[in-house]
């Protein structure tokens, strides 16, 4: 069964969502992310994706207190991303309750450091973030398109021990227009043992069903839930 991973994106300690990574499109859904996380847990959710959008913009962890509150008041398994650029950032994330961390920009900008993290913490705790725009990896909160092509990037890091990848098609993220199903099928055809976490574009329970039928191991979703396109009750079929 596909693993369900709701997302809580944080700006100024509040639960927000963006469209295509545009900070100008910010919409606040809840002033208290802890209450959101507790509601998820009460409905059978076991895993949570927390993104520090302030951290992504400022290149260091910012909303670690919110992470700590969610971790201390729920039993959710949390993966945390956004602005992780140093050993200190990772220590802050893990000390404040993250069980896993996601590195995207750092894997492009400083691959030696990212590989040290894989070696030090293990592939169970380090997730590769592959944020894609026109099949190139985007960095710095999706504001900059790098020269890294998606498939060589994935091949390189799977050879270096990465087992889990969050792949976000930026053109789909927050648009409620459906996920990049063909892209995910292509990735799994090339990397059949990869724990691929699809992210971006999920607009309905049918999208989750389609990803499940395509063999995608896990899915991250946010706006569809916050906008009422998907209900927590509907998700029970996958739990």
Curated annotation (Swiss-Prot):
It is found in: Cytoplasm. Its EC number is 5.3.1.16. Its main location: cytoplasm. It comes from the Bacteria. One of its GO terms (biological process) is L-tryptophan biosynthetic process. It catalyses: 1-(5-phospho-beta-D-ribosyl)-5-[(5-phospho-beta-D-ribosylamino)methylideneamino]imidazole-4-carboxamide = 5-[(5-phospho-1-deoxy-D-ribulos-1-ylimino)methylamino]-1-(5-phospho-beta-D-ribosyl)imidazole-4-carboxamide. GO terms for cellular component: cytoplasm. Keywords: Amino-acid biosynthesis, Cytoplasm, Histidine biosynthesis, Isomerase. Pathway: Amino-acid biosynthesis; L-histidine biosynthesis; L-histidine from 5-phospho-alpha-D-ribose 1-diphosphate: step 4/9. The active site is at residues 9, 131. GO terms for molecular function: 1-(5-phosphoribosyl)-5-[(5-phosphoribosylamino)methylideneamino]imidazole-4-carboxamide isomerase activity. CDD domains: HisA. InterPro entries: Aldolase_TIM, His_biosynth, HisA_bact_arch, Isoase_HisA-like, Isoase_HisA-like_bact, RibuloseP-bd_barrel. It is an enzyme of class 5 (isomerase). Belongs to the HisA/HisF family. HAMAP family: HisA. This is 1-(5-phosphoribosyl)-5-[(5-phosphoribosylamino)methylideneamino] imidazole-4-carboxamide isomerase. It comes from Bacteroides fragilis (strain YCH46).
